[in-house]
Amino acid sequence: MKRTLIGMLLVSLCGGAAASPLSAWNDTPAKQAIETWVHDATDANNHAFIPPEKRYVVFDNDGTLWPEAPITFQIQFVLDEVKRLAPEHPEWQNDPLVSAVLKNDLKTVAAAGEKGLLKLLAFTHSDITTDEFNKRVASWIDTHKDARFGCQYNQMGYQPMRQLLDYLRENGFKTWIISGGGIDFMRVLSEKMYGIPPEQVVGSFALGEFSLTKDGSQIRKTMQGAFNDDAANKPVAIHLFMGQRPVAAFGNSDGDLAMMQYTASNPDYKTFGLLVHHTDAAREYAYDSHPPASGKLVEGLKVAKEKGWVVVDMQKDWKTVFDPAQCPAKTAQ
């Protein structure tokens, strides 16, 4: 009897010590809704069961899996690349947009709008082989840190969302990124950061040019045939790259609304929708209708209420924002 009691105690202690797969989430209705949907979708005896081959789920990246404020990380990469490359390009010397970048005059850069952004993207994302571009992104990720948090960008994935990705995969779901960010940029880091392989990452892209070389072959990036994977283009990209309608969608802005509506209208299965609402100025940023750069969230909140989607209140629903082992918490002063 004594041994039995000791054994029961050990089992109890071990069970109590086991970490919850969503330990970075507070025990709120948002977390409970996730767990309930996953349970029902994976229970073969439940009317909401989804066969494993149909368990495709899609995530936005900027603002959903990692921060997009005060500017997106890819835009920061563009600015840093212009500064790094400028000495090699004397023809840029009299360009007012480049001068603004070199002076950290972000107001002038922002005022240049989409036309200015495309120009900077042409300077940093075209007429370069895909292999060289990947090396540049990897080097930047390994050597640059976020100005506010002092962490490397690849350490700033939201811990609750990274846990959610793992949790879904453990339950037989296939996780995809469908984002307005550059497809090549995200593919460099997606597997290491999120466990999502490059072939399951879809983003904005332009056509490349193939050619043979003395050492084999290469693809050079161009700005031709650019496709902006945002808003109404997201469902189009899902159709082109995935070939089937998702059963769950996770986003944070009105730019994700079409993707979520496309998912919600899946005629065969009970779907799930979740929006991350940035409400934590102390641990991250707080915005919706007036974001620092991208991520406006107005219409999405209205539709979420109508459709019964989960709206995550970052301040209340997340126990941690970043993994403290990688990016120790820093609150606003």
Task: Explain the meaning of each model-derived region.
Residues M1-A18:
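Gram-negative bacterial Sec-dependent N-terminal signal peptides
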Residues T4, T64, T175:
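Ser/Thr-centric signal marking residues that sit
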Residues A19-W25, P29-E35, H39, K54, ...:
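C-terminal cap/substrate-recognition subdomain and adjoining C-terminal extension
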Residues D43-N45, W66-E68, F210-S211:
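Short, solvent-exposed loop/turn elements at domain surfaces
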Residues H47-P51:
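Short loop/turn motifs at secondary-structure junctions and domain boundaries
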Residues R55-P70, M260:
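Asp-based phosphoryl-transfer active-site loop
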Residues W66-E68, T108, K192, E199:
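Secretory-pathway/luminal and periplasmic proteins that interact with or process carbohydrate-rich
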Residues P70-I71, Q76-Q155, Q159:
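A metal-dependent, Asp-based hydrolase signature
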